[in-house]
Amino acid sequence: MTGLDRERIVDGAPALSAEELQAALAGLPGWQLAGDGKSICREWRFKNFKQAAQLANLAAWQAEAAGHHPDIAFGWGHARVSYSTHSAGGVSRNDLIMAARLDAATG
């Protein structure tokens, strides 16, 4: 998935097939298909609330800049980000791009 974080978000991106999604997730360590089968998610653990809030804010700022918004949950010592393309009814390449951007920003 080299360079995925630099790809453009495209309106109307279709949902990926199960095979495409599994292949793509292999290049995004830590990301997995959620139980609903229609979103990808990743969880982080931190030493305090501040770090969890910083990750949540980073994901939110990236989402606003791209116009593609995840579900974000966080609390003391943990954060979870989930991406799905609701208009496509599942995971699109846009979700993978946003996951890669978040990974690139968090190192």
From Swiss-Prot:
It catalyses: (4aS,6R)-4a-hydroxy-L-erythro-5,6,7,8-tetrahydrobiopterin = (6R)-L-erythro-6,7-dihydrobiopterin + H2O. InterPro entries: PCD_sf, Pterin_deHydtase. One of its GO terms (molecular function) is 4-alpha-hydroxytetrahydrobiopterin dehydratase activity. Keywords: Lyase. The keyword Lyase applies. It holds the Pfam family Pterin_4a. It comes from the Bacteria. Its EC number is 4.2.1.96. The keyword Lipid metabolism does not apply. One of its GO terms (biological process) is tetrahydrobiopterin biosynthetic process. Belongs to the pterin-4-alpha-carbinolamine dehydratase family. This is Putative pterin-4-alpha-carbinolamine dehydratase. It comes from Paracoccus denitrificans (strain Pd 1222). The lineage of its organism: Bacteria, Pseudomonadati, Pseudomonadota, Alphaproteobacteria, Rhodobacterales.
